[in-house]
Amino acid sequence: MPYLLISTQIRMEVGPTMVGDEHSDPELMQHLGASKRSVLGNNFYEYYVNDPPRIVLDKLECKGFRVLSMTGVGQTLVWCLHKE
């Protein structure tokens, strides 16, 4: 899976950061220290970490990922990363 989306809401300085969905690479999620959860009302699982996005981006860079784009939608910030 060469593409990855991460996101955070409201305050990017403190986290949590959403780092994957139920189809994400388990080995990568373990490297990030992510936990899998299902939020009440959602019919899907997501992986999250308590780290702020900057820490997550640093960890992903060590795994060969590079940021392609970043945007803000309402109070949510989203980064799209790619691994060659």
UniProtKB/Swiss-Prot annotation:
Location within or outside the cell: Nucleus; Nucleus membrane; Cytoplasm, Cytosol
The keyword Nucleus is annotated on this UniProt entry: yes
Single GO term (MF): GTP cyclohydrolase I regulator activity
Chloroplast is among the record's keywords: no
GO cellular component: cytosol; dendrite; melanosome; nuclear membrane; nucleoplasm
Subunit structure: Homopentamer. Forms a complex with GCH1 where a GCH1 homodecamer is sandwiched by two GFRP homopentamers. Interacts with GCH1.
Protein name: GTP cyclohydrolase 1 feedback regulatory protein
